[in-house]
UniProtKB/Swiss-Prot annotation:
Its main location: plastid. One of its GO terms (biological process) is mRNA processing. One of its GO terms (molecular function) is RNA binding. Pfam families: Intron_maturas2, MatK_N. One of its GO terms (cellular component) is chloroplast. Usually encoded in the trnK tRNA gene intron. Probably assists in splicing its own and other chloroplast group II introns. This is Maturase K. It is found in: Plastid, Chloroplast. It comes from Lablab purpureus.
């Protein structure tokens, strides 16, 4: 193993040299369309791809080593071929595979060297730890900042970030030339679309890679600011140095006394700061004065403007107090509410009951997200009304019942941790009525006549009872413990969660 690690260490300085030749191999493009991406599912380009087409495109690319980019000779420039859209799509997919190979090699080498990534980030948590964090720590914090990660990022900045990760200069200049020649950055990233939709389907692999690279760069700087902000010293008039201009100011500092330098602003040294991100939104919560969270707001604005050349509008960051405002996150409507709890205190021989106010995180099922998810599954109309699913009318009665039961089960699992389930019960009624309408349409009858004829009302009630849905989560033997443990249970299916989150 040590010899193998030494071999990988030797190859570490050379593996970037293989990126440029890999870009011209047709087998890379076969991998692009034959295997799934690390970032998303496999994307098919209208089923027009074949290895022969990719081989011809790579052959043309390899033969034309000089690129004529003059304006007077624009008609003769055939860097890829006559079908620009299709050939450029093939090249983008190949580029996505090459950079994924690069980052997979980096992860593999890091894992053999003692899992440096895991050791460097001891506080790295999965998405499953978000809900315990909301219930255990969020109630003790008092300020929250809703952050919408801005876009689009300039192409040159994204290319510079990719160059820092890939040390192959030839490969970097080739893909940079290709981007500037064939594409307009504003057309790739429409400025008035949400982050979840501005990645076009035909370029999903490469765009997800570039966006994740941008987020990684942005959060790395944020982590640096978080770790170093409490170590900055002050001048004699107690002005806190901004991290963005810290190195410039340090050059012109006048030497002051040790006593003056020892002062620090205590409210900038905050250990209770938490950052949670999912897709294009993030939440920054902390426990301190409003001045600190306003400082962090301007940190983010200056970071986006100075480092990424992005104008952050006034609606990018919203600052609220947790006790006075609620927020949407991961399909839930969360708020920190104060609940009165009675505690028995024993003093000497007498016992007295004292009422204490305890903060609890109250989560409610969002009706808009639940209705939109049900409409996306063709189980309800867009106006949150029951509708007959025409696509399921050709199935058997059992398959139709099983389909609606599965949707209702997912809703029940996902919102089981919510305190108020009024919206969920409304969606449950819509699903039940849509199931009846679908069965009635299949048998060419009205809903009332169908229920009377087949006596299915009892069957549907059995399928959609709360007891039956709860038994799918816990075994029957655990029902006796329900009176002892009354804690809420969060459903942590990360794949099904996307159906709810995408509607925000």
């Amino acid at each position: 193993m040590e010899q193998y690690q030494a071999y990988l260490e030797l190859r570490r300085s050379r593996y970037q040299d293989i990126l440029y030749p890999l870009f011209f191999r047709e087998s890379i493009y076969g991998l692009a369309y034959g295997h799934e991406s690390f970032f998303t599912e496999n994307v098919d380009y209208n089923n027009k791809f074949s290895l022969l087409i990719x081989q011809r495109x790579s052959t043309r690319m390899y033969q034309q080593t000089h690129f004529s980019l003059c304006a007077n000779d624009s008609n003769k420039n055939t860097f890829v071929g006559y079908n620009y859209n299709f050939d450029s799509q093939i090249i983008l997919e190949g580029f996505g595979v090459v950079v994924e190979i690069l980052f997979s090699l980096q992860l593999f080498i890091s894992s053999l060297r003692g899992l440096e990534i895991v050791k460097s980030y001891q506080n790295l948590q999965s998405i499953h730890s978000i809900f315990p964090f909301f219930e255990d720590k969020l109630i003790y914090l008092n300020h929250k900042s809703d952050i919408r990660i801005p876009y689009p990022i300039h192409l040159e900045i994204x290319x510079x970030x990719x160059x820092x990760x890939x040390x192959x200069x030839x490969f970097f200049h080739l893909i940079r030339l290709f981007f500037y020649y064939y594409y307009n950055w504003n057309s790739l990233f429409p400025p008035k679309k949400r982050i979840s939709t501005f990645f076009s389907k035909r370029n999903l692999r490469i765009f997800l890679f570039l966006y994740n690279l941008y987020v990684w760069e942005y959060e790395s700087i944020f982590l640096f600011l978080r770790n170093k902000c409490s170590q900055l010293q002050l001048k004699h008039f107690l002005v806190f140095f901004e991290r963005i201009f810290f190195y410039e100011k340090r050059k012109h500092l006048v030497e002051v006394s040790t006593k003056t330098c020892s002062y620090t602003l205590f409210f900038f040294k905050d250990t209770f700061i938490h950052y949670v991100r999912y897709k294009g939104k993030s939440i920054l919560v902390l426990k301190n004065t409003p001045l600190l969270i306003n400082k962090w707001k301007y940190y983010f604005i200056y970071l986006w403007q100075c480092h990424f050349d992005i104008w952050a509008g006034p609606g990018t960051i919203y600052i609220n107090q947790l006790s006075q405002x609620s927020f949407h996150f991961l399909g839930y409507f969360l708020s920190x509410x104060x609940x009165x709890x009675x505690x028995x205190x024993x003093x000497x021989x007498x016992x007295x009951x004292x009422x204490x106010x305890x903060x609890x995180x109250x989560x409610x099922x969002x009706x808009x997200x639940x209705x939109x998810x049900x409409x996306x599954x063709x189980x309800x109309x867009x106006x949150x009304x029951x509708x007959x699913x025409x696509x399921x009318a050709n199935f058997s009665d059992f398959d139709i019942l099983d389909r609606f039961l599965r949707i209702c089960r997912n809703f029940s699992h996902y919102y089981n941790g919510s305190a108020k389930k009024k919206s969920f019960y409304q969606i449950k009624y819509i699903l039940r009525f849509s199931c009846i309408k679908t069965l009635a349409r299949k048998h060419k009858s009205t809903v009332r006549t169908f229920l009377k004829k087949l006596s299915s009302e009892k069957l549907l009630e059995e399928f959609f009872t709360e007891e039956d849905l709860f038994s799918l989560i816990f075994p029957r033997t655990s029902f006796t413990l329900r009176g002892v443990y009354r804690g809420r249970i969060w459903y942590l299916d990360i794949f099904f969660r996307n159906d709810f989150v995408n509607h925000f």
